A protein has these predicted regions:
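Compositionally biased amphipathic helical and low-complexity segments enriched in hydrophobic
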Residues: 4-12, 16, 40, 88-91, ...
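N-terminal accessory regions of nucleic-acid-interacting proteins
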Residues: 4-51, 55, 401-404
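Intrinsically disordered, low-complexity segments enriched in small/polar residues
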Residues: 12-14, 20, 174, 283, ...
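Short, solvent-exposed coil/turn linker segments
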Residues: 19, 31-34, 83, 142, ...
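Generic signal for short, ordered secondary-structure residues
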Residues: 24, 95, 125-126, 156, ...
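Conserved DEDDh/DEDDy metal-dependent 3′-5′ exonuclease domain
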Residues: 29-39, 46-53, 57-194
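Accessory DNA-binding and partner-docking regions appended to nucleic-acid-acting proteins
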Residues: 192-404
Length: 404
């Protein structure tokens, strides 16, 4: 009898919750958390020609490595939230994500491309709205700013760094995840119009082509500038070796290496290596070393082995002409700034300020590499071509930049 009396209010509460679930999102939201559902989704999306994409991942924040947690897709009709941790693999998505005929809309997509590549998928047909927006006359430098500028939409980004690996995402996370993709399509339409107006469509296409070949960022341990400044070569070698030890310990625990042993702890071990106190010293550093004897013993053995490293051999000194060397030229910062100011004015005569500003990105570094004799530039060819067109038009001699 009690249960019968409770049914009406429970039913009312359930219907109310369902009706009020995501009123901010004007599209249905579908969860994909099985391999079968992912395969079905891939078949369903086989005929779309425009797909908005975003990802949420953990890059050494809570776990070891680059861990893809959530993929958000929007096909113009519905939002699909793919729980990566619940799936055995993402291979069912390859035909869609790697199909160049399907335009994939992203915003600031370099890391999204990398995290897909880590998972065995190389996206094709990408369209990054961040550079495209600036090359289309919009001034905002963030997605939230662009949404406000173009669509008049306010976007709360506070959930961006929340824990996306939780078994159940909270309501705010779900709304945030959906918002990250549903506005990319109307933004794309506005940006295309701006690109046509300023004749920058080819520039945008080149930016997108460069994005597709971006490589996964290095994650291996590296010395920091303070290590090079404050420690001798032997100590630097010891610090780097201990960083590799720490990396291995982080893999065992599936935790970011700096959670296990901080840079300060490593520096302390190296600075006081003659008085290294072993397991007791490690237990004072981190709770991870107080959890189990086997892990503590392994860490102690590996650290002691690392501290036995001898001095590294002397650096090889090559004869002057043994290796190709960059020319050592000193450029005048004042003259570089004068040149950039003139180039900006030249671009402003052809484009609006936001386009001109974007086209000037990277010019300083390019100039220094060019004047040093480098021939492998990390600088988009279309921007290089525009700059040299200006130099030819103005008759400017780059040798004027060299300090007398």
């Amino acid at each position: 009898m009690y249960l019968l009396l409770m049914l009406p209010p429970l039913l009312f509460w359930y219907l109310y919750q369902m009706s009020m679930r995501y009123p901010e999102i004007p599209y249905p939201i579908h969860w994909i958390d099985t391999n079968e559902a992912l395969l079905e989704l891939s078949n369903q999306l086989a005929f779309v020609r425009l797909l908005a994409i975003d990802t949420e991942f953990d890059r050494f924040r809570r776990k070891y490595g680059i861990n893809l947690e959530l993929i958000q897709l929007f096909d113009g009709e519905a939002v699909y939230l793919i729980r990566v941790g619940a799936l055995s693999n993402l291979l069912s998505l390859k035909p869609i994500i790697e199909n160049p005929a399907v335009i994939k809309l992203l915003y600031s997509g370099s890391e999204d491309i990398q995290v897909f590549k880590v998972n065995g998928i190389a996206p094709k047909g990408v369209y990054d709205l961040q550079p495209a927006s600036q090359l289309s006359g919009f001034s905002a430098m963030s997605l939230a700013g662009l949404l406000q500028e173009v669509l008049g939409v306010s976007f709360d980004k506070s959930k961006q760094t929340s824990d996306w690996s939780k078994p159940q995402l909270d309501r705010e996370q779900i709304v945030y995840a959906a918002n990250d993709v549903i506005y990319l399509v109307p933004l794309y339409n506005q940006i295309k119009e701006g690109a046509a107006r300023f004749c920058t469509t080819d520039f945008i296409n080149e930016e997108n082509a460069l994005l597709e070949v971006v490589e996964v960022s290095e994650t291996k341990p590296r010395l920091k500038q303070r290590h090079r400044e404050n420690f001798n070569r032997h100590e630097q070698a010891l610090i780097l070796e201990l960083m590799h030890v720490r990396d291995g310990l982080g893999q065992i625990l599936n935790k970011p290496p700096h959670f296990v042993l901080s840079d300060g702890h490593i520096e302390d071990i190296v600075s006081r290596r003659d008085n290294y106190a072993g397991t007791e010293q490690l237990k004072a550093y981190s709770a991870f070393f107080r959890r189990g004897y086997d892990f503590l013993s392994k860490a102690d053995r590996d650290i002691r082995a690392a501290l036995t490293m001898p001095w590294p051999p002397p650096k090889t000194v090559h004869a002057r002409n043994d290796l190709p060397r960059l020319q050592k030229v000193v450029l005048s910062n004042e003259k570089i700034e004068d040149l950039l100011q003139s180039y900006t004015l030249y671009l402003n005569e052809q484009y609006v300020e936001s386009v001109a500003t974007y086209l000037c990105n990277g010019i300083r570094r390019y100039l220094r590499e060019l004047m040093a004799g480098a021939d492998d530039f990390n600088f988009p060819p279309y921007r290089r071509k525009l700059f040299h067109q200006y130099l030819n038009t103005s008759g400017f001699d780059l040798n004027q930049l060299v300090e007398a």
